[in-house]
UniProtKB/Swiss-Prot annotation:
Gene: KCNH6
PROSITE patterns (UniProt xref): CNMP_BINDING_3, PAS
Comp. bias regions, Basic and acidic residues: 213-222, 1179-1195
Glycosylation site residues: 437, 594
Keyword Cell membrane: yes
Region (cNMP-binding domain) residue spans: 739-839
Membrane topology (Cytoplasmic): 1-405, 465-485, 537-543, 657-1202
A molecular-function term among this protein's GO annotations: inward rectifier potassium channel activity
Top-rank taxon: Eukaryota
Organism per entry: Gallus gallus
Name of the protein: Voltage-gated inwardly rectifying potassium channel KCNH6
Length: 1202
């Protein structure tokens, strides 16, 4: 099965690979030459090739090699592709612009579940970029960890690298330095051993990784560095010293501009310091002789000292440049010379601790600056930020958003507790002693109310400094304008709600004061308008609306409960008979009121719960009657509550039911549609595999579209709005696809209207083998695979195009492979007829579109394009209509099947029509196989027994008269418009009979070649031998039909000539034909010049009775007369050798015109041939129908020359 049987895990791997940022390609190991089936965008950007140019090429990447690419590297790559193990190698590759670079290629085989390699992944890395990235990495973090670990270690350093630190140290700001900088410059064979460095176990784990990285860097660096003059010391295996220590040569990394030096061994710290001073002196001498020094010391010499705490961008860049210079600063504070440990083979950068602190400080300050969005961090090219006054708060700032939600919670608290406090708490009688002796802070609710009042006052102050948006959509930050805007808006309501009335009238315990406080506190409920405005944005969500409606219902019930208690409490002292609901409540719960005891009666809790129960039962129209109104005031209030309840019940709960129905509407539609699908499956008895695919696709499509039919939605809008919507839906394709660049907005709108969107789940087959390619596909998301005989030949991803090149073929072909989705795919597709229709409307954009359209994979099956008799008739009509399209008119375009241009086709025709080189029977079969029966019609008038001769419709010479020029032009334009497919190869038909050979006809040959060049049909197609006989039979039938049609035309011509002969004056008559009124016939006088007929073809054997000389002259006369009548088609039948078309009835019947002897008939014939052939009868207008009938026959599209 090959790679067609990819498991789901591999499909996920392919989809993940398509989204990676690496530069790679995928090749199929089971195809010839391991053809490339996919390359990502990074690969295309690296080498400059498009995906179309890379697909199906061998993965040996021969197109990337150049003159400097070594054959050994190519052989290594080829050997890696023959193996089954991962391999890395370096190759010199060339980009499309001929620039070369060293590339690191990683060949990774992909195996299937059987362990067989089915694919190769080739990952490409620019070696120069890889070295630049790795050289910029710093190892000081790991070294700082090694110092803190306290483990001894012996390190070997590259002396030239250590020597460069002097220049770096001199360029850095001078400060207290607690480390030792060692610089060396003298080459020698000594080495330096530093012992007792502390390292951590973590570093030991990464040594091998670092060594492998340096190994990869070492070779390219040596090749790229022209200054290297010393050989590279080879790495020696570590050997155990006499005291059990290890001695080893380390890698010496080459850097640009540097040189290699050896290391010498020192045994004490004094020798270490002596060596340090010696090399410092030599370095100063070297630096004096050469400005800037060598290598990295030269880079460091021009760096100016920079304060470590600088925070500007330029200073940070300078300091970053300094920090990237390799530093070898050694701290000997924690050295222990008695402990030895085998050192790493890599160079290690050591940075003094206070330098690390400075870097950390700079990074912290930089991060702080970025987080604060300072002006020096913002880009140079930016929008001008609005100028904000000091202490002004932006209305869209996070602080204002949090503050608004806090005020919203306080308003909700006010809406709940203000009515409760005004109704229940303020009417509670307290002892005078407690009331006067206790301060305001005795009641917790008073403390909370005080905090709420303070917050409302602060909110007023903040609103005076908060920006707003004016009617011009401008942010206003001017304090004066903000104040005016706030005064005109919510200031009065906020001010009333923020006044602490209970503090202003505290300690005045009269009843009037208590009632006033309760009424004033209810003014805070005006802030609920802000709550409604704040929560209005959530009105589109059904669940949020449902929650808000329930809260509103509960809040209104709470308010009504407070009012219900206030009515009963106010009326009770004035009633003689205690019949109020509060007295009834006391009797029911056993807590009767006692006028002498103010604390008697039900508690506040009992009163509130009972009042709330009554209001809820009244609002919901339940009303059990256990709490009933008894007084008139209570009854009136109950009526009001019932009215409010009916309205609220109808609005709120009706809205709730609608919301619930809307929430479940999608589910209901899903179940309804799913039921239809199941009924369809059951009714048609769909098999289980297909049934499962159908159900899975329906479920996924529903989750993707939620059951919304976009076509049904778009049909409800006008065309202009539909075009805008389609343009928005296809904007990504139209903007990113190269083929649509340069299109006008009207063209894009027309194309967007024709595009359809398709969604395909994994495993769904989009195109099957043999399907007619009537659609062009554009992939916008996901990946697909193309399979030929269950072998993956290509993997396409985002922005790829597959189908067939419509501009090269006038008739849709058939698919040569299966197209299957690997992941969930979104595709845009357009029908070829719709695309051609739009391009015909915009011919200026058509050429640009065809030139920029790059089809990633051509699905057209070029080997076999089956044709059926029914499809041929359709093909004729299709080509005839499509020939009028300007979008397909591309001159000198190579033939799609043969790859030949018009000039090559003309040369081919010249060879085929050369009489000196007649075609054999086999050659004729080959030529005939390229012709199609497209030109045959539905009316079958052929006579099987009629003789068939060679046919040649020859275009008359255009050198005679202007009429002949006009006729030739009209004939050529007519032929270019109506001939739809490859016609009978007329000039080559003479070679079908070996006894006949045509003469040279250069002008007709040129006309035929032009006709062929104006079509987009291949001249030669590869047909099987079995089809040649059918082609010959169709050719025979075609000639028979042409013969019968021409016979009927000749009969009409002869009838007309009989009427003309009676009016045309004889040759000896003094009347000149020019005396006729030319305007009556609508013919220009300049057309009176005689027409020179084509010379008759010589026939070797004249055995047919109709081919006698007398008959030939009469036939020539008849056909010459026909030329005068054929104003629409300027065709001339030369002679009987050229064309002898007559029926058996005509052959056996007497001639219509009695032939005269040649000497008597010659003058008449000459007069007819040389004179102007005008219809002599003024009644020629009555015979217009006959002319039209002739034109109708001649304009029949079945004639190959027309």
């Amino acid at each position: 099965m090959g790679s067609a049987a990819l498991p789901h895990a591999r499909q996920r791997w392919v989809s993940h690979a398509l989204d990676s940022n690496r530069k790679f390609l995928i090749a199929n190991a089971q195809m010839e030459n391991c053809a490339i089936i996919y390359c990502n965008d990074g690969f295309c950007e690296m080498f400059g090739y498009s995906r179309v140019e890379v697909m199906q090429r061998p993965c040996t990447c021969d197109f990337l090699t150049g003159p400097d690419t070594t054959k050994s590297s190519i052989a290594q790559l080829t050997q890696a592709l023959l193996g089954s193990e991962e391999c890395k190698l370096e190759i010199l590759y060339y980009r499309k612009d001929t620039s070369c670079f060293r590339c690191l290629v990683d060949v990774v085989p992909v195996k299937n579940e059987d362990g067989v390699v089915i694919m190769f992944i080739l990952n490409f890395e620019d070696l120069a970029q890889l070295i630049a990235k790795s050289s910029g990495r710093s190892l000081h973090h790991r070294l700082s960890q090694s110092w803190r670990a306290g483990e001894g270690r012996r390190l070997k350093f590259s002396l030239p690298s250590l020597r460069r630190l002097k220049a770096q140290r001199n360029s850095l700001p001078t400060s207290e330095f607690d480390g030792v900088a060692i610089d060396y410059g003298k080459p020698g064979g000594d080495s330096l051993i530093l012992r007792d460095l502390k390292t951590s176990p973590k570093e030991n784990c990464v040594q091998s990784e670092t060594e492998s990285l340096l190994e990869k860097e070492r070779r390219p660096s040596l090749e790229a560095d022209p200054t290297l003059q010393h050989p590279i010391p080879k790495q020696e295996p570590p050997s155990l010293g006499p005291r059990g220590s290890y001695s080893a040569w380390g890698f010496i990394r080459s850097r640009p501009g540097g040189s290699f030096h050896s290391l010498r061994r020192v045994s004490s710290l004094d020798n270490f310091e002596a060596a340090r001073s010696e090399f410092q002196r030599k370095f100063r001498e070297r630096r004096a002789n050469s400005e800037g020094g060598m290598g990295l010391s030269g880079k460091a010499s021009h760096v100016k000292p920079n304060p470590p705490n600088s925070t500007s961008d330029s200073d940070l860049m300078k300091y970053r440049t300094i920090s990237q210079i390799p530093q070898f600063t050694l701290n000997f504070v924690e050295f222990n010379l008695e402990k030895h440990r085998s050192g790493s083979t890599t160079e290690i950068e050591i940075i003094a601790p206070h330098k690390v602190t400075e870097r950390t400080q700079n990074v912290t300050e930089k991060v702080t600056q970025v987080l604060s969005l300072g002006a020096d961090v913002l880009p140079e090219y930016k929008l001008q930020a609005p100028r904000i006054h000091r202490w002004t708060i932006l209305h869209y700032s996070p602080f204002k958003a949090v503050w608004d939600w806090l005020i919203l919670l306080l308003v909700i608290y006010t809406a709940v507790f203000t009515p409760y406090s005004a109704a229940f708490l303020l009417n509670e009688e307290q002892g005078e002693e407690k009331h006067w002796n206790c301060s305001y802070s005795c009641d917790p609710l008073n403390i909370i109310d005080l905090i709420v009042d303070i917050m409302f006052i602060v909110d007023i102050v903040i609103n005076f400094r908060t920006t707003y948006v004016n009617i011009n959509d401008e942010v206003v930050s001017h304090p004066g304008k903000i104040a005016i805007h706030y005064f005109k808006g919510w200031f009065l309501i906020d001010m009333v709600a923020a006044i602490p009335f209970d503090l202003l009238i505290f300690r005045s315990g009269s009843d009037e004061t208590t009632t006033l406080i309760g009424l004033l506190k209810t003014a805070r409920l005006l802030r609920l308008v802000r709550v409604a405005r704040k929560l209005d944005r959530y009105s589109e969500y059904g669940a949020a609306v449902l929650f808000l409606l329930m809260c509103t219902f509960a809040l209104i019930a709470h308010w009504l409960a407070c009012i219900w208690y206030a009515i009963g409490n106010v009326e009770r002292p004035y009633m003689e008979h205690k019949i109020g609901w509060l007295d009834n409540l006391g009797d029911q719960i056993g807590k009767r009121y006692n006028d002498s005891d103010l604390s008697s009666g039900p508690s506040i809790k009992d009163k509130y719960v009972t009042a709330l129960y009554f209001t809820f039962s009244s609002l919901t129209s339940v009303g059990f009657g256990n709490v009933s109104p008894n007084t008139n005031s209570e009854k009136i209030f109950s009526i009001c509550v019932m009215l409010i309840g009916s309205l609220m019940y109808a609005s709120i709960f009706g809205n709730v039911s609608a919301i619930i129905q809307r929430l479940y509407s999608g589910t209901a539609r899903y179940h309804t549609q799913m039921l239809r699908v199941k009924e369809f499956i059951r009714f048609h008895q769909i098999p289980n595999p297909l049934r499962q695919r159908l159900e899975e696709y329906f479920q996924h499509a529903w989750s993707y579209t939620n059951g919304i039919d976009m076509n049904a939605v778009l049909k409800g809008f006008p065309d202009c709005l539909q075009a805008d919507i389609c343009l928005h839906l296809n904007r990504t394709l139209l903007q990113n696809c190269k083929a649509f660049r340069g299109a006008s907005k009207g063209c894009l709108r027309a194309l967007a209207m024709k595009f359809k969107t398709t969604h395909a789940p994994p495993g769904d087959t989009l195109v099957h083998y043999g399907d007619v390619l009537t659609t062009l596909y554009f992939i916008s998301r996901g990946s697909i695979e193309i399979l030929k005989e269950d072998i993956v030949v290509a993997i396409l991803g985002k922005n790829d195009i597959f189908g067939e090149p419509i501009s090269l073929y006038a008739r849709p072909g058939k698919s040569n492979a299966d197209v299957r989705a690997l992941t969930y795919c979104d595709l845009h597709k357009i029908q070829r007829e719709d695309l051609l229709e739009v391009l015909d409307m915009y011919p200026a954009f058509s050429d640009n579109f065809w030139s920029n359209l790059e089809i990633t994979f051509n699905l057209r099956d070029a080997d076999s394009v089956p044709r059926t008799p029914l499809s041929e008739e359709y093909d004729c009509t299709y080509r005839r209509v499509r020939r009028r399209k300007h979008s397909l008119c591309q001159p000198n375009k190579p033939d799609p099947d043969t790859g030949t241009s018009d000039a090559e086709q003309y040369h081919t025709y010249s060879e085929l029509t050369n009489p000196q080189d007649p075609l054999s029977k086999d050659q004729w079969d080959d030529v005939g196989s390229s012709t199609t029966p497209c030109s045959q019609t539905s009316d079958d008038e052929a006579k099987p027994g009629s003789p068939t001769k060679a046919l040649s419709l020859v275009t008359a010479s255009a050198s005679g008269t202007e009429v002949s020029k006009q006729a030739a032009e009209s004939s050529q334009s007519y032929a270019g418009t109506h001939i739809c497919t490859t016609p009978l190869d007329i000039p080559n038909m003479f070679t079908f009979w070996e006894d006949q050979r045509p003469n040279h006809h250069p002008e007709p040959l040129q006309h035929v070649s032009l006709v062929h060049s104006s079509r987009d049909i291949p001249l030669h197609s590869d047909y099987r031998p079995g089809q040649i006989e059918s082609r010959l039979e169709l050719l025979q039938a075609q000639l028979s039909r042409l013969e019968s049609r021409m016979s009927s035309d000749i009969n009409i011509i002869l009838q007309l000539l009989q009427r003309q002969l009676s009016q045309v004056p004889p040759a000896y008559s003094p009347i000149s034909p020019s005396s006729h009124n030319l305007a009556m016939y609508g013919i220009v006088p300049r057309s009176l010049e005689p027409l020179t007929p084509c010379a008759p073809l010589e026939d070797e054997q004249q055995t047919a009775p109709g081919q006698s000389p007398s008959y030939a002259e009469v036939e020539k006369f008849h056909l010459k007369s026909r030329h005068s009548l054929s104003s629409g088609m300027h065709l001339t039948v030369a002679s009987d050798e050229t064309m002898t078309v007559y029926s058996e009835q005509e052959h056996h019947s007497p001639p219509l015109l009695n032939p005269e002897p040649p000497h008597q008939r010659a003058p008449n014939t000459q007069g007819l041939l040389r004179g102007s052939r005008f219809p002599s009868l003024p009644e020629h207008l009555e015979a217009s129908s006959e002319h039209q009938d002739i034109q109708r026959h001649l304009s029949d599209p079945v004639l190959p020359g027309s």
